[in-house]
Curated annotation (Swiss-Prot):
Upper taxonomic lineage: Eukaryota, Metazoa, Chordata, Craniata, Vertebrata
Protein name (database record): Sorting nexin-30
Entry keyword Cytoplasm: no
The keyword Ion transport is assigned to this record: no
Function of the protein: Involved in the regulation of endocytosis and in several stages of intracellular trafficking. Together with SNX4, involved in autophagosome assembly.
Coiled coil ranges: none
C-alpha cells in the first residue's frame, strides 16, 4: 500500500454467562433472579481494564532475548488453540474469491460464501453462494429486528473517502473480505444467532433477492414486542451493573480511537521516511560510479538501504492491513453494544411505568396484569442475553487483542532483524577494504 499505485481487481456455540438460566426457559422469574451467579460489574470491569485483559501468553514479562522465531512459535500456538476449539463446531463458514462485476448502472464486488455443516437445519452438507455487501447489510438488519436482545457483530464501514481509497483496489477488497469473513464467523459461533432463519437463508439461498421480496420470516415474540416499544417511557435509573458496562464501553472506544489516531500518524511518518530512504539509497549507487576502490562498499551501502526500505514497507503494510482494522472493528462493536443497552433501557422504562400505573390503582385485591408480566419477562430476557453476550464479547476481545499485540511485536522484531542483518552484511566488505590498504 505504501509503494506504488493500488493493484486493480481482475474482472470476471459458547454458553451463556456462568450457565445462567434464561428467564423464559421454563423457570420462574424468581428462580432466574435468585440463581443468578453473574459476576458483578466490578469484576467485569476488572477483567476489562486489569492486567488480565491484554496479558501476553508469556505472562507479560519483558523478553529481552526474544527473537522472531520465538514470537512466531507463539503465534503458531495461538493458532493451534483455535484449531482445537474448532473441533467441537458443527458449522463452518468462509468468505473468499471476491469478483468485480461491471454492469450498465453500477459496478460492485461479490464474495463467495462456502458453508459446511452437519446441522439438521441444512438440507445439504455444503453450500456455495455469492453475496455482495448490501446482502450482508440486509442480514445484519434482519438479525437486529429478530434478535433485539442480542449483540449483533458490526459490519465494516460501507463508505470510504473518495480519492483516498479505491474501493475496487485489490488491497481494499481483501481487507473488506477479511472483515466480512470475521462478521460471519462471529455469527456462526453465537449459540442463538447461528440458528436464525435469516442467517440460514443467507447462507443457502441461490436467489436471495427473491426471499427479500417475499418478506417472510416472522419476528420472534420477544423481537416483535421490543420493536413496538416506543420511546415515550423515561428510565428512572439504570442498574449499576449496566451503568458500569456503559461507562466501560465509552472509555474503551475512546482509548481505541486515540490509539488509532496515533497509529495513523506513525504510519504517515513511516511512509515519509520510506520515501526519503528510496531517494537516499540510489545516491550511494550513483556515487560508486565515480569511485574506483570505494565502488563496491558504496554499492553495498546502497543495497543495504534498499533492504531496509523494503522491510519498512512490509511493516507499514502489516500495520495498515492487520492492526488498524481490528481497532476500528471494536469501536463499531462498542457502538453496537450501546445500541442494545438503549433497547434494554426502553424495556425497563416501559416495565417501570406499567408497574407504577398498577400500584396507583385503588383495588382491594390488586393483581398484576398479564401485559406487565410479559414486560417483566422481556426485561429479564434482555438482562440475561446482554450479560451473556457481554461475557462472550469480553472473551473474544481478550483473544483478538492478544493475537493482535503478539503479531505486532512479531512484525516489529522481524523488521529490526532484517535491518540488522542488512547492515551486518556489509561489515565484512568494509573490513576487507581496510585490510587491503
Amino acid at each position: 500500500m505504501a509503494g506504488g499505485p493500488p493493484k486493480a481487481l481482475p474482472s470476471t456455540g459458547p454458553q451463556s454467562l456462568r450457565d445462567m438460566p434464561h428467564p423464559l426457559a421454563g423457570s420462574s422469574s424468581e428462580e432466574a433472579v435468585g440463581g443468578d451467579s453473574t459476576p458483578s460489574p466490578d469484576l467485569l470491569m476488572a477483567r476489562s481494564f486489569g492486567d488480565k485483559d491484554l496479558i501476553l501468553p508469556n505472562g507479560g514479562t519483558p523478553a529481552g532475548t526474544a527473537s522472531p522465531a520465538s514470537s512466531s512459535s507463539l503465534l503458531n500456538r495461538l493458532q493451534l488453540d483455535d484449531d482445537i476449539d474448532g473441533e467441537a463446531r458443527d458449522l463452518f463458514v468462509t468468505v473468499d474469491d471476491p469478483k468485480k462485476h461491471v454492469c450498465t448502472m453500477e459496478t460492485y464486488i461479490t464474495y463467495r460464501i462456502t458453508t459446511k455443516s452437519t446441522r439438521v437445519e441444512f438440507d445439504l452438507p455444503e453450500y456455495s453462494v455469492r453475496r455482495r455487501y448490501q446482502d450482508f447489510d440486509w442480514l445484519r438488519n434482519k438479525l437486529e429486528e429478530s434478535q433485539p436482545t442480542h449483540l449483533i457483530p458490526p459490519l465494516p464501514e460501507k463508505f470510504v473517502v473518495k480519492g483516498v481509497v479505491d474501493r475496487f483496489s485489490e488491497e481494499f477488497v481483501e481487507t473488506r473480505r477479511k472483515a466480512l469473513d470475521k462478521f460471519l464467523k462471529r455469527i456462526t459461533d453465537h449459540p442463538v444467532l447461528s440458528f436464525n432463519e435469516h442467517f440460514n437463508v443467507f447462507l443457502t439461498a441461490k436467489d436471495l433477492n427473491a426471499y427479500k421480496k417475499q418478506g417472510i420470516a416472522l419476528l420472534s415474540r420477544v423481537g416483535e414486542s421490543v420493536k413496538h416499544v416506543t420511546g415515550g417511557y423515561k428510565l428512572r435509573s439504570r442498574p449499576l451493573e449496566f451503568a458500569a458496562i456503559s461507562d466501560y464501553l465509552d472509555t474503551f472506544a475512546l482509548k481505541l480511537g486515540t490509539i488509532d489516531r496515533i497509529a495513523q500518524r506513525i504510519i504517515k511518518e513511516e511512509i515519509e521516511y520510506l520515501v526519503e530512504l528510496r531517494e537516499y539509497g540510489p545516491v550511494y549507487s550513483t556515487w560508486s560510479a565515480l569511485e574506483g576502490e570505494l565502488a563496491e562498499p558504496l554499492e553495498g551501502v546502497s543495497a543495504c538501504i534498499g533492504n531496509c526500505s523494503t522491510a519498512l514497507e512490509e511493516l507499514t503494510d502489516d500495520i495498515t492491513e492487520e492492526f488498524l482494522p481490528v481497532l476500528r472493528e471494536y469501536v463499531l462493536y462498542s457502538d453496537s453494544m450501546k445500541g442494545v443497552l438503549k433497547k434494554r433501557d426502553q424495556v425497563q422504562a416501559e416495565y417501570e411505568a406499567k408497574l407504577e400505573a398498577v400500584a396507583l390503582r385503588k383495588e382491594e385485591r390488586p393483581k398484576v396484569p398479564a401485559d406487565v408480566e410479559k414486560c417483566q419477562d422481556r426485561m429479564e430476557c434482555f438482562n440475561a442475553d446482554l450479560k451473556a453476550d457481554m461475557e462472550r464479547w469480553q472473551s473474544n476481545k481478550r483473544h483478538d487483542f492478544r493475537q493482535l499485540l503478539v503479531g505486532l511485536a512479531d512484525k516489529n522484531i522481524q523488521y529490526y532483524e532484517k535491518c540488522l542483518m542488512a547492515w551486518e552484511s556489509i561489515i565484512p566488505l568494509l573490513q576487507e577494504k581496510q585490510e587491503t590498504k
